[in-house]
From Swiss-Prot:
This is Dehydrin DHN4. GO terms for biological process: cold acclimation; response to abscisic acid; response to water deprivation. Residues 21-39 have a biased composition (Gly residues). GO terms for cellular component: cytosol. Residues 1-78 are annotated as: Disordered. The keyword Transmembrane does not apply. PANTHER family: DEHYDRIN RAB16B, DEHYDRIN XERO 2-RELATED.
Length: 225
């Protein structure tokens, strides 16, 4: 097939020759005359934005700076979730761990013993399990029948650590019964009047048959014989 046409000797910006689009007529092999645009082969370098070998990807928008970073090859790669989290943490460090809830506060209930009273009262083997409750400052009721601690009942009554161990009473009236740690062990003893009767830890152990309470008080008072 004959080809006639004009070719413009132009070059592109890189100096490569660019064939022009000429209009020519060609004589077909079978005598037909045809007209058409000359197929001047354009040569253009591959300058698409998606170039093989470089992988250039142009992005628009403000979020690209925070969600991607340069991969060193002219492109950008997606940041991982851990890297994003590290950037959002104060100072950009993600290796600071805050252990929450490691210092819990627990309360332990130990039963009904010593519930009603104040300052650590203990009731050990009373029938109700609430021995020496109304007394103050650490009274202990061990084996009394009641041990519930209304003033003047078993293992109560006295203040500042009075202890009633086995008898049904062992205390006496309110505010009596050996202030500051008097202990009544078996019977009706361990009582005494207010401010007397075994101050600072006197022990009343027997059944009250050896000496009367008033005799004991007189012996303890200064100047009394």
């Amino acid at each position: 097939m004959e080809y006639q046409g004009q070719q413009h000797g132009r070059v592109d910006e890189y100096g490569n020759p660019v064939a022009g689009h000429g209009v020519g007529t060609g004589m077909g092999t079978h005598g037909g005359v045809g007209t058409g645009a000359a197929a001047g082969g354009h040569y253009q370098p591959m300058r698409d934005e998606h170039q093989t070998g470089r992988g250039i990807l142009h992005r628009s928008g403000s979020s690209s700076s925070s969600s991607s970073e340069d991969d060193g090859m002219g492109g950008r790669r997606k940041k991982g979730i851990k890297e994003k989290i590290k950037e959002k943490l104060p100072g950009g460090h993600g290796d600071q761990q805050h252990n929450a809830g490691t210092y819990g506060y627990g309360q332990q209930g130990t039963g009904m013993a010593g519930t009603g009273g104040t300052y650590g009262q203990q009731g050990h083997t009373g029938m109700t399990g609430m021995g020496a409750t109304d007394g103050t400052y650490g009274q202990q009721g061990h084996t009394g029948m009641a041990g519930t601690g209304a003033h003047g009942t078993a293992a109560t009554g006295g203040t500042y650590g009075q202890q009633g161990h086995t008898g049904m009473t062992g205390t006496g009236m309110h505010g009596t019964g050996g202030t500051y740690g008097q202990q009544g062990h078996t019977g009706m003893t361990g009582t005494g009047m207010h401010g007397t009767g075994g101050t600072y830890g006197q022990h009343g152990t027997d059944t009250g048959e050896k000496k009367g309470i008033m005799d004991k008080i007189k012996e303890k008072l200064p100047g009394q014989h």
